[in-house]
């Protein structure tokens, strides 16, 4: 069985919950990524921060990106999978919560991220279409 650990992007860097939105955006630009996990002072996952969050929930909401922090934009709910999760379990989490990336946890620590592209490489073509439709429904685009 293929697991999250098998297909994840390891070596993921967290943005600290006290880091500014500007610092997070600069890191995203430098590393050509669209999302970062938010970790607290306890090194545990507190949420995810996307480039879209910075624009919609930060800038468009009038927050100052030089003083507003990643932690302020952390979502109330944290969606993740265990490192031993199957592809189906990952699909279920991503589809249910309409997210394109899901952090991978092992022993309460962040060990990687699985993206929609990582999963798509392990699905038959007909399943890819269904998966993309499920995570890109109008509800996902409106939130």
Swiss-Prot record:
Amino acids binding Zn(2+) 1: 97
First-listed, main subcellular location of the protein, grouped into a coarse class: secreted
Record-linked Pfam families: CBS (PF00571)
Induction: A member of the dormancy regulon. Induced in response to reduced oxygen tension (hypoxia), low levels of nitric oxide (NO) and carbon monoxide (CO). It is hoped that this regulon will give insight into the latent, or dormant phase of infection. Following a shift from stationary to anaerobic growth this protein is not seen to not be further induced (at protein level). Induced in mouse lungs at the same time that adaptive host immunity induces bacterial growth arrest; induction is dependent on interferon gamma.
Residues in the signal sequence: none
One BP term from GO: response to hypoxia
Protein function: Unlike some other CBS-domain containing proteins does not seem to bind AMP.
Protein's UniProt name: Hypoxic response protein 1
Organism: Mycobacterium tuberculosis (strain ATCC 25618 / H37Rv)
């Amino acid at each position: 069985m293929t697991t999250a650990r098998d297909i994840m992007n390891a070596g993921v860097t967290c943005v600290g919950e006290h880091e500014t939105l500007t610092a997070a955006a600069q890191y995203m630009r430098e590393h050509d990524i669209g999302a970062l996990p938010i970790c607290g002072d306890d090194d545990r996952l507190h949420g995810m921060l996307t480039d879209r969050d910075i624009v919609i929930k930060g800038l468009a909401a009038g927050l100052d990106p030089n003083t507003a922090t990643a932690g302020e934009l952390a979502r109330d709910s944290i969606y993740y999978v265990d490192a031993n999760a199957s592809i189906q379990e990952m699909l279920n989490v991503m589809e249910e919560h309409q997210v394109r990336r899901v952090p991978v946890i092992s022993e309460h620590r962040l060990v990687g991220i699985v993206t929609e592209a990582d999963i798509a490489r392990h699905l038959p073509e007909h399943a890819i279409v269904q998966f993309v439709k499920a995570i890109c429904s109008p509800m996902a685009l409106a939130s």
